Amino acid sequence: MRLVVVAGPTASGKTALAIALARRLGGEIVNADSQQVYRGLDVGTAKPTAEERGAAPHHLLDLVEPGEGMDAARFAALADAAIAGIAARGRVPIVAGGTGLYVRALLHGVVEAPGRDPALRAALEEEAARLGRPAVHARLAAVDPAAAERIRPNDLVRVVRALEIAAGGRTPSELYQAHAFREDRYDAALLALDPPRAELHARIDARVRAMFAGGLLDEARALEARFVGALPARLPIGYAEAAAHLRGELDLEEAIRRVQVAHRRYARRQVIWLRRERGVAWIAPPHDVEALSRRVLEPRPPAIR
Protein backbone atom coordinates (compact mmCIF):
# COMPACT_ATOMS: atom_id res chain seq x y z
CA MET A 1 0.00 0.00 0.00
CA ARG A 2 1.33 3.41 -0.93
CA LEU A 3 0.77 6.20 1.59
CA VAL A 4 0.72 9.74 0.20
CA VAL A 5 1.80 12.53 2.55
CA VAL A 6 1.21 16.20 1.73
CA ALA A 7 3.22 18.40 4.10
CA GLY A 8 4.55 21.94 4.09
CA PRO A 9 4.31 25.24 5.95
CA THR A 10 1.07 26.83 7.03
CA ALA A 11 -0.91 28.57 4.26
CA SER A 12 1.06 26.79 1.52
CA GLY A 13 -1.99 25.07 0.01
CA LYS A 14 -1.82 21.59 1.57
CA THR A 15 -5.58 21.17 1.89
CA ALA A 16 -6.27 22.15 -1.71
CA LEU A 17 -3.60 19.81 -3.08
CA ALA A 18 -4.67 16.93 -0.82
CA ILE A 19 -8.28 17.28 -1.98
CA ALA A 20 -7.22 17.46 -5.63
CA LEU A 21 -5.12 14.30 -5.22
CA ALA A 22 -7.92 12.54 -3.33
CA ARG A 23 -10.39 13.26 -6.11
CA ARG A 24 -7.92 12.15 -8.75
CA LEU A 25 -6.78 8.97 -6.97
CA GLY A 26 -9.95 7.95 -5.16
CA GLY A 27 -8.46 8.83 -1.79
CA GLU A 28 -9.42 9.87 1.71
CA ILE A 29 -7.57 12.46 3.78
CA VAL A 30 -6.06 11.92 7.22
CA ASN A 31 -5.39 15.15 9.12
CA ALA A 32 -1.86 15.64 10.47
CA ASP A 33 -2.27 19.18 11.81
CA SER A 34 -2.05 19.32 15.60
CA GLN A 35 -4.16 22.50 15.70
CA GLN A 36 -7.10 21.00 13.81
CA VAL A 37 -7.76 18.23 16.33
CA TYR A 38 -9.61 20.68 18.63
CA ARG A 39 -13.38 20.87 18.50
CA GLY A 40 -14.87 24.32 18.04
CA LEU A 41 -11.63 25.94 16.88
CA ASP A 42 -12.36 26.05 13.18
CA VAL A 43 -11.63 29.51 11.80
CA GLY A 44 -8.42 30.09 13.75
CA THR A 45 -6.94 26.76 12.64
CA ALA A 46 -8.00 27.02 8.97
CA LYS A 47 -9.82 23.73 9.37
CA PRO A 48 -11.25 22.33 6.12
CA THR A 49 -14.67 23.81 5.43
CA ALA A 50 -17.85 21.80 5.05
CA GLU A 51 -17.51 22.19 1.28
CA GLU A 52 -13.92 20.89 1.35
CA ARG A 53 -14.91 17.96 3.56
CA GLY A 54 -17.66 17.18 1.10
CA ALA A 55 -15.16 17.05 -1.75
CA ALA A 56 -13.18 14.25 -0.05
CA PRO A 57 -13.65 12.29 3.19
CA HIS A 58 -11.54 13.67 6.07
CA HIS A 59 -10.37 11.85 9.21
CA LEU A 60 -8.87 12.92 12.58
CA LEU A 61 -10.47 16.34 12.80
CA ASP A 62 -12.31 17.50 15.96
CA LEU A 63 -10.87 14.81 18.22
CA VAL A 64 -10.49 16.60 21.57
CA GLU A 65 -11.80 19.59 23.48
CA PRO A 66 -9.66 22.73 23.87
CA GLY A 67 -7.37 22.23 26.84
CA GLU A 68 -7.17 18.45 26.41
CA GLY A 69 -3.93 16.80 25.40
CA MET A 70 -3.01 15.11 22.13
CA ASP A 71 0.51 13.80 21.66
CA ALA A 72 2.35 12.31 18.70
CA ALA A 73 2.05 8.73 19.95
CA ARG A 74 -1.73 8.97 20.27
CA PHE A 75 -1.97 10.65 16.89
CA ALA A 76 0.09 7.90 15.24
CA ALA A 77 -2.14 5.20 16.73
CA LEU A 78 -5.30 6.95 15.53
CA ALA A 79 -3.77 7.60 12.12
CA ASP A 80 -2.74 3.94 11.80
CA ALA A 81 -6.35 2.90 12.39
CA ALA A 82 -7.71 5.48 9.93
CA ILE A 83 -5.19 4.46 7.25
CA ALA A 84 -6.01 0.77 7.71
CA GLY A 85 -9.71 1.53 7.28
CA ILE A 86 -9.11 3.56 4.13
CA ALA A 87 -6.95 0.83 2.62
CA ALA A 88 -9.54 -1.81 3.51
CA ARG A 89 -12.09 0.16 1.48
CA GLY A 90 -9.76 0.01 -1.52
CA ARG A 91 -9.00 3.73 -1.41
CA VAL A 92 -5.76 5.71 -1.21
CA PRO A 93 -4.81 7.20 2.19
CA ILE A 94 -3.54 10.77 1.91
CA VAL A 95 -2.05 12.31 5.05
CA ALA A 96 -2.17 16.12 5.00
CA GLY A 97 -0.77 18.49 7.58
CA GLY A 98 2.18 20.54 8.67
CA THR A 99 2.90 19.17 12.15
CA GLY A 100 6.31 17.62 11.62
CA LEU A 101 6.26 15.67 14.87
CA TYR A 102 3.01 13.97 13.85
CA VAL A 103 4.31 13.12 10.39
CA ARG A 104 7.55 11.76 11.81
CA ALA A 105 5.75 9.68 14.44
CA LEU A 106 3.53 8.18 11.75
CA LEU A 107 6.32 7.42 9.29
CA HIS A 108 9.13 6.45 11.69
CA GLY A 109 7.66 5.71 15.12
CA VAL A 110 7.90 7.55 18.43
CA VAL A 111 10.60 7.89 21.05
CA GLU A 112 10.18 5.82 24.20
CA ALA A 113 10.36 8.50 26.90
CA PRO A 114 10.11 8.43 30.71
CA GLY A 115 6.65 8.55 32.25
CA ARG A 116 5.03 11.68 33.63
CA ASP A 117 6.03 13.09 37.03
CA PRO A 118 2.96 14.74 38.63
CA ALA A 119 4.97 16.39 41.42
CA LEU A 120 7.53 17.92 39.05
CA ARG A 121 4.77 18.95 36.66
CA ALA A 122 2.85 20.72 39.43
CA ALA A 123 5.99 22.51 40.62
CA LEU A 124 6.84 23.73 37.12
CA GLU A 125 3.29 24.87 36.44
CA GLU A 126 3.30 26.78 39.74
CA GLU A 127 6.61 28.40 38.79
CA ALA A 128 5.16 29.42 35.42
CA ALA A 129 2.14 30.98 37.14
CA ARG A 130 4.40 32.86 39.57
CA LEU A 131 7.32 33.90 37.35
CA GLY A 132 5.94 33.54 33.83
CA ARG A 133 6.32 30.88 31.17
CA PRO A 134 9.62 32.28 29.83
CA ALA A 135 11.23 31.47 33.20
CA VAL A 136 10.33 27.78 32.83
CA HIS A 137 11.47 27.85 29.21
CA ALA A 138 14.82 29.22 30.42
CA ARG A 139 15.19 26.10 32.57
CA LEU A 140 14.80 23.99 29.44
CA ALA A 141 17.29 26.13 27.52
CA ALA A 142 19.84 25.51 30.27
CA VAL A 143 19.60 21.71 30.05
CA ASP A 144 18.67 21.18 26.39
CA PRO A 145 19.23 24.23 24.14
CA ALA A 146 18.20 22.32 21.02
CA ALA A 147 14.83 21.37 22.52
CA ALA A 148 14.32 24.94 23.72
CA GLU A 149 14.91 26.15 20.17
CA ARG A 150 12.18 23.82 18.88
CA ILE A 151 9.57 24.64 21.54
CA ARG A 152 7.95 28.05 21.90
CA PRO A 153 8.29 29.67 25.39
CA ASN A 154 4.50 29.96 25.64
CA ASP A 155 3.95 26.26 24.89
CA LEU A 156 3.98 25.33 28.56
CA VAL A 157 2.70 21.79 28.01
CA ARG A 158 5.62 20.84 25.77
CA VAL A 159 8.18 22.76 27.86
CA VAL A 160 7.09 20.94 31.01
CA ARG A 161 7.10 17.58 29.24
CA ALA A 162 10.63 18.21 27.96
CA LEU A 163 11.81 19.00 31.49
CA GLU A 164 10.10 15.85 32.78
CA ILE A 165 12.05 13.83 30.22
CA ALA A 166 15.32 15.57 31.09
CA ALA A 167 14.76 14.80 34.78
CA GLY A 168 14.85 11.11 33.83
CA GLY A 169 18.55 11.36 33.02
CA ARG A 170 18.61 11.97 29.25
CA THR A 171 17.50 15.12 27.49
CA PRO A 172 14.81 15.03 24.80
CA SER A 173 17.44 15.79 22.16
CA GLU A 174 19.58 12.87 23.32
CA LEU A 175 16.60 10.52 23.13
CA TYR A 176 15.68 11.73 19.64
CA GLN A 177 19.27 11.33 18.46
CA ALA A 178 19.44 7.78 19.85
CA HIS A 179 16.14 6.84 18.16
CA ALA A 180 17.36 8.32 14.84
CA PHE A 181 13.91 7.72 13.25
CA ARG A 182 15.40 5.27 10.75
CA GLU A 183 12.46 2.85 10.72
CA ASP A 184 10.09 3.23 7.78
CA ARG A 185 6.65 2.22 8.99
CA TYR A 186 5.00 2.90 5.62
CA ASP A 187 5.86 2.91 1.95
CA ALA A 188 5.28 6.65 1.71
CA ALA A 189 5.52 9.32 -0.96
CA LEU A 190 6.28 12.48 1.00
CA LEU A 191 5.48 15.73 -0.80
CA ALA A 192 6.35 19.09 0.76
CA LEU A 193 4.93 22.29 -0.67
CA ASP A 194 7.55 24.97 -1.21
CA PRO A 195 6.10 28.32 -2.32
CA PRO A 196 8.42 31.34 -2.59
CA ARG A 197 8.86 33.02 0.79
CA ALA A 198 7.35 36.35 -0.26
CA GLU A 199 4.30 34.57 -1.66
CA LEU A 200 3.94 32.47 1.49
CA HIS A 201 4.16 35.50 3.78
CA ALA A 202 1.56 37.32 1.70
CA ARG A 203 -0.76 34.31 1.95
CA ILE A 204 -0.21 34.09 5.70
CA ASP A 205 -0.95 37.79 6.20
CA ALA A 206 -4.11 37.59 4.10
CA ARG A 207 -5.27 34.42 5.84
CA VAL A 208 -4.84 35.97 9.30
CA ARG A 209 -6.87 39.03 8.31
CA ALA A 210 -9.57 36.73 6.94
CA MET A 211 -9.57 34.78 10.21
CA PHE A 212 -10.17 37.92 12.27
CA ALA A 213 -12.92 39.02 9.88
CA GLY A 214 -14.45 35.57 9.57
CA GLY A 215 -15.04 34.29 13.08
CA LEU A 216 -11.80 34.01 15.06
CA LEU A 217 -12.99 36.64 17.52
CA ASP A 218 -16.24 34.73 18.06
CA GLU A 219 -14.30 31.53 18.75
CA ALA A 220 -12.01 33.37 21.18
CA ARG A 221 -15.05 34.89 22.89
CA ALA A 222 -16.52 31.41 23.37
CA LEU A 223 -13.24 30.24 24.90
CA GLU A 224 -13.18 33.22 27.27
CA ALA A 225 -16.70 32.38 28.41
CA ARG A 226 -15.85 28.72 28.88
CA PHE A 227 -12.50 29.15 30.64
CA VAL A 228 -13.22 32.09 32.92
CA GLY A 229 -10.04 33.56 34.37
CA ALA A 230 -7.41 31.75 32.31
CA LEU A 231 -7.37 30.19 28.86
CA PRO A 232 -5.78 26.75 28.48
CA ALA A 233 -1.98 26.82 28.32
CA ARG A 234 -1.85 25.20 24.91
CA LEU A 235 -4.05 26.77 22.26
CA PRO A 236 -3.50 27.18 18.52
CA ILE A 237 -1.81 30.36 17.32
CA GLY A 238 -4.06 33.41 17.36
CA TYR A 239 -6.52 32.65 20.13
CA ALA A 240 -4.55 34.30 22.94
CA GLU A 241 -4.10 37.45 20.84
CA ALA A 242 -7.76 37.51 19.83
CA ALA A 243 -8.79 37.11 23.47
CA ALA A 244 -6.41 39.91 24.49
CA HIS A 245 -8.10 42.16 21.93
CA LEU A 246 -11.52 41.28 23.31
CA ARG A 247 -10.31 42.21 26.81
CA GLY A 248 -9.11 45.58 25.53
CA GLU A 249 -5.43 44.72 26.00
CA LEU A 250 -4.55 44.93 22.28
CA ASP A 251 -6.05 47.01 19.52
CA LEU A 252 -7.22 45.06 16.49
CA GLU A 253 -4.33 45.93 14.19
CA GLU A 254 -1.74 45.00 16.81
CA ALA A 255 -3.48 41.69 17.47
CA ILE A 256 -3.52 40.94 13.73
CA ARG A 257 0.15 41.90 13.38
CA ARG A 258 1.22 39.64 16.25
CA VAL A 259 -0.66 36.68 14.85
CA GLN A 260 0.81 37.25 11.39
CA VAL A 261 4.32 37.28 12.88
CA ALA A 262 3.60 34.14 14.91
CA HIS A 263 2.36 32.28 11.84
CA ARG A 264 5.40 33.33 9.80
CA ARG A 265 7.70 32.04 12.54
CA TYR A 266 5.71 28.83 12.73
CA ALA A 267 6.01 28.39 8.96
CA ARG A 268 9.78 28.79 9.24
CA ARG A 269 9.97 26.10 11.93
CA GLN A 270 7.83 23.78 9.79
CA VAL A 271 10.19 24.16 6.82
CA ILE A 272 13.27 23.58 9.01
CA TRP A 273 11.68 20.42 10.40
CA LEU A 274 10.83 19.07 6.96
CA ARG A 275 14.31 19.79 5.60
CA ARG A 276 15.65 17.39 8.23
CA GLU A 277 13.32 14.64 6.99
CA ARG A 278 14.72 12.24 4.42
CA GLY A 279 13.05 11.36 1.15
CA VAL A 280 11.10 14.61 0.77
CA ALA A 281 10.03 15.78 -2.68
CA TRP A 282 9.76 19.58 -2.55
CA ILE A 283 6.98 20.82 -4.81
CA ALA A 284 6.91 24.41 -6.04
CA PRO A 285 3.70 25.96 -7.41
CA PRO A 286 1.86 25.63 -9.69
CA HIS A 287 0.97 22.01 -8.96
CA ASP A 288 0.36 19.62 -11.85
CA VAL A 289 -2.11 17.33 -10.09
CA GLU A 290 -2.23 14.81 -12.93
CA ALA A 291 1.57 14.42 -12.99
CA LEU A 292 1.77 14.25 -9.20
CA SER A 293 -0.97 11.62 -9.13
CA ARG A 294 1.09 9.39 -11.39
CA ARG A 295 4.29 10.14 -9.55
CA VAL A 296 3.14 9.29 -6.02
CA LEU A 297 1.85 5.87 -7.04
CA GLU A 298 5.00 4.73 -8.84
CA PRO A 299 6.63 1.76 -7.06
CA ARG A 300 9.80 3.71 -6.33
CA PRO A 301 9.49 7.33 -7.46
CA PRO A 302 13.13 8.34 -7.94
CA ALA A 303 12.66 11.90 -6.70
CA ILE A 304 10.82 10.73 -3.60
CA ARG A 305 12.60 7.59 -2.42
From Swiss-Prot:
The record marks 99, 121 as: Interaction with substrate tRNA. It catalyses: adenosine(37) in tRNA + dimethylallyl diphosphate = N(6)-dimethylallyladenosine(37) in tRNA + diphosphate. InterPro entries: Dimethylallyltransferase (IPR039657), IPT (IPR018022), P-loop_NTPase (IPR027417). Its EC number is 2.5.1.75. GO terms for biological process: tRNA modification. One of its GO terms (molecular function) is tRNA dimethylallyltransferase activity. It holds the Pfam family IPPT. ATP binds at residues 8-15. Its cofactor is Mg(2+). It is an enzyme of class 2 (transferase). Keywords: ATP-binding, Magnesium, Nucleotide-binding, Transferase, tRNA processing. The keyword Hydrolase does not apply. Residues 33-36 are annotated as: Interaction with substrate tRNA. SUPFAM superfamilies: P-loop containing nucleoside triphosphate hydrolases. The keyword Nucleotide-binding applies. Disulfide bonds: none annotated. Substrate binds at residues 10-15. PANTHER family: TRNA DIMETHYLALLYLTRANSFERASE. Monomer. Belongs to the IPP transferase family. Catalyzes the transfer of a dimethylallyl group onto the adenine at position 37 in tRNAs that read codons beginning with uridine, leading to the formation of N6-(dimethylallyl)adenosine (i(6)A). This is tRNA dimethylallyltransferase. It comes from Anaeromyxobacter dehalogenans (strain 2CP-1 / ATCC BAA-258). The lineage of its organism: Bacteria, Pseudomonadati, Myxococcota, Myxococcia, Myxococcales.
